Structures are given as C-alpha cells and as structure tokens.
A protein has these predicted regions:
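Pyridoxal 5′-phosphate
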Residues: 1-326
Length: 326
C-alpha cells in the first residue's frame, strides 16, 4: 500500500486503550494529567478541551467567543459550514479570501475590527503556506489555527482534527491559554480523543525529500498534461498539488486505489462528500476545473524504483481514462 493522501486521512497503528484514561470526579486522574503535561511540553499551551469536529462543534466555539470573528475561506469544511450556520443565526462573520495563486489574502485583514481570526499556517487541500507572523502584523485579533498538518508557534490557539490524524472521527482537541474558552467538566472530556491525538502527533513523521523527486518525475512523464494551480515552492515541504488535463480526479483516485495507491482531490474527497475541491473554487476556478486537482502528501520513505512505479502506473491509468473520455 502506498499512501499519498496521509494529510487528508491517516490511520493510527497499534491503538491501545487503557482504563487509566477513564476520568472520574472522585479520584485522581493521574494518567490524564500526564497527557495534558505532554501537550504543554510539545506546544506550550496551559489549557485543553475537546469539542465535536463538526459544524455544530465549531458553532459552539463561536458562541463561547466574546467578540467579532473572521474566518479564512481556506479552512476546514466543518469550520466553513459552522461560519455559514453562525451567519444564519443573525451573527456576522468577516470572510478572508484566497488569491488566484492560492495564498490567503492577508491584506484583507487591514483595518478590520475583529477579535478572533480562524487562520491556519496552511490552506486546506493545496497546503499553501500562510505566515501567522505576517498576519499578526496586520491584526491584533487572537489567531486560532488548525495544527493537524503543521504547527506554528505564533498561533494563539490551536486545534487538531482527529479524523485526519488517526482515522477515527473522535472529538477534536483544542489547546489555549487565558480565558478564551471555558474548560469542560471531567465527565464531558473525551479523554480517548486526547490520548489518541497525542499518540498520532508523537508519531507524526514527514518526508521532506520526496516532493522534489515526484515533481520532476511527474513533469517528465506527463509533460503538457500536468499543470499547477499553486506554486509548488509555496506549499508545505511534504506536500505536492497539481492538476491533470482532461479527466476528473475521482476517476484516477478510484482506479489507483485498485492498485493500492491512494491519492486525494481534497477534503471533499477524503470526507466522503463526493465534492470537488472547494479550495480551488475559492481561488476563482469553476467547479469543472476544480475536479482536475490532485493532492499528494509524503510521510513514508520510498525507493527510486517505487517512485518510478507509481508515476508509471499513474501515467498509464491517466492515458486510459483520458482515451475513454475523448
């Protein structure tokens, strides 16, 4: 099995669940306290809570925030849907757009009267990098970031998407300081989500070498049939995003899966929504074009012959699909 979709869906191996992580209001919860200390050591935040990683869960977080909220349209599907739901209830959201090159338009933050900004250090699907440090020069808002694929120490609050980290839709984990959010009572904390999330983060490993190799091989093989929505130099070093002319990504995704090669079009693909990349559409492309997008991410090491094999199979399947579509 060759997983090139690990940033969209990763499966935690050798899951171990102990009764030690069952929380009680009447006895010490030493194992759980140890977990919270490990999070603090890794990320520097003093407080932790769990929440439903869904539009309803994010809506609950919005309602806890005492202030004006802005959201980058490059965030997770659940967060975007929560923003729309929040607006339907009569509240206001300031939306920060993407440029045609896939970068967050940080200049839209200038002169905005906002207190909280949902902005991650990368855009979903394309994994185009965003400088939280630069964003802080343009706004005094507290910045709340998804740190599942990349952690930026400049974020004021971070959260983790457990479905993408462990392959199970347990609660999300939120880390923060001060009194931005309320803490949960013992009986409402999803301690298993906290444990499994930490296990995944401690075992998270990225391959920084494969991007350049795959990029070269794909260009060489596909030639004029490959194109790029975003500059590869602007994306996370362990990710690669491109488009293939004349086919829908889902056709290639399904075909390659039969060869145990797993790739993605984006969140709409990995979450089972059967939707093309919303991010590409937010960049100004139409829905049809967004169906061409393909995302790779790199964790495991691969030998040169394995890379060649993947590229050869991808090229063969691409030509077959394209011939059938013509």
């Amino acid at each position: 099995m060759i997983k090139l979709n690990s940033l969209q869906y990763s499966k935690l191996q050798n899951i171990e669940i102990l009764n030690d992580f069952s929380l009680s209001a009447l006895t010490p919860n030493d194992s759980f306290e140890t977990l919270t200390l490990e999070y603090k050591k890794m990320f520097g935040f003093n407080k932790l809570k769990t929440f439903s990683f869904s539009k309803e869960g994010f809506l609950g977080l919005f309602l806890e925030l005492k202030g004006k909220i802005a959201i980058s349209v490059g965030e997770s599907e659940a967060l975007i849907e929560a923003g729309k739901l929040y607006e339907s209830l009569g509240f206001h959201i300031t939306w920060i757009n993407l440029n045609k090159d896939g970068k967050v338009n940080l200049f839209e933050l200038e002169n905005q009267n906002i207190d909280f900004l949902f902005l991650s250090s990368y855009v979903m699907d394309t994994f185009v990098k965003t400088s939280i440090e630069e964003a802080k020069k343009l706004t005094s808002a507290k910045i709340i970031s998804n740190a599942s694929a990349n952690f930026d120490k400049n974020s004021d609050v971070v959260f983790f998407d457990n479905y993408k980290l462990i392959g199970f839709n347990t609660s999300g984990v939120l880390l923060f300081n001060d009194e931005i959010f309320s803490l949960l009572e013992v009986g409402k904390i999803d301690s298993l989500a906290v444990k499994l999330c930490l296990d995944a983060l401690k075992n998270q490993n990225f391959n920084y070498k494969l991007k350049a190799i795959f990029l070269e091989k794909l260009k060489e093989k596909l030639q004029e049939n490959i194109y790029f929505f975003v500059n590869s130099n602007d994306t996370l070093e362990y990710s690669l995003h491109f488009g293939l002319k004349g086919i829908k990504a889902r056709e290639l995704i399904r075909t390659l899966a039969l060869n145990n090669i797993f790739i993605s079009n984006g969140e709409g693909c990995s979450l089972g929504l059967s939707k093309p990349s919303r991010i590409i559409q937010n960049m100004g492309y139409d829905e049809q074009t967004s169906r061409n997008a393909i995302s790779f991410s790199f964790i495991d090491d691969m030998k040169n012959e394995d890379i060649e094999k993947v590229v050869d199979i991808l090229y063969l399947k691409y030509k077959q699909i394209k011939a059938l579509n013509d």
